[in-house]
Amino acid sequence: KANSGELRLDAERIGISGQSSGGHLAMLSAMRPFDSRYSSIPLDADMPDVDACVRCVGMSWPVINPLSRYRYALQERKNEAEWVGDIPECHDLYWVTDKNMIDGNPVCALENGETVQRPPAIWIQGRPDPVHDYLDPESELGIKEPERFAQRYREAGGDIEVLYIKQTERDSRASFDPLAAFFRKYLG
């Protein structure tokens, strides 16, 4: 937004998008645009005074709940699931503690009643996808994470669509076209 003039953009028509961990970060930053932890690098004095609010969020198979995904990966490693790879070690390296995974967690923010921004959102989810579309056994809802987040987001007053596509079509128009239509709808 601060460079919108130079980039010839309308600062009021900014959306954000990401895949997997990037989808998690997109939603987290969209929900907490005024959180000082996410704006600790000051803008140059000659830059316009802007906020980090976005008009909409597009997510593709996000790691929306880092803690449940971490625990799920540890459990599935015991079952020798090939997809697990080094996911737990990467979580340990990035997050360090469970407390951090809770703090940086859009699902926990909603379930804990945190006051957050709720821009319109879309979640594109491939199926079958054991890495992102799974059931957290600790959830009271008994539904997989995409639907859990969507339900909590709606309960908080947000508008979100969850669109399921074939896992084999994630890198195709089946994924890209709905995102493009979503951004056209909200950004004009």
Region spans (language model):
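Serine-hydrolase-like catalytic core of hydrolytic proteins
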Residues: K1-G15, P119, S139-E145, R152-Y153
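Primarily recognizes the serine-hydrolase "nucleophile elbow" in alpha/beta-hydrolase
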Residues: K1-L74
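Surface-exposed acidic, glycine-flexible loop patches that form ligand/cofactor-binding
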Residues: G5-R8, D46-D51, C108-Q117, L187
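Stable alpha-helical elements in mature extracytoplasmic
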Residues: S21-L25, V50, P106, E145, ...
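Mobile cap/lid helix-loop segments that gate and shape the active-site cleft of serine hydrolases
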Residues: P33, S39-S40, S68-G113
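Short, proline-enriched alpha-helix->beta-strand connector loops that line the catalytic pocket
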Residues: V50-R55, E114-I122, A156-D159
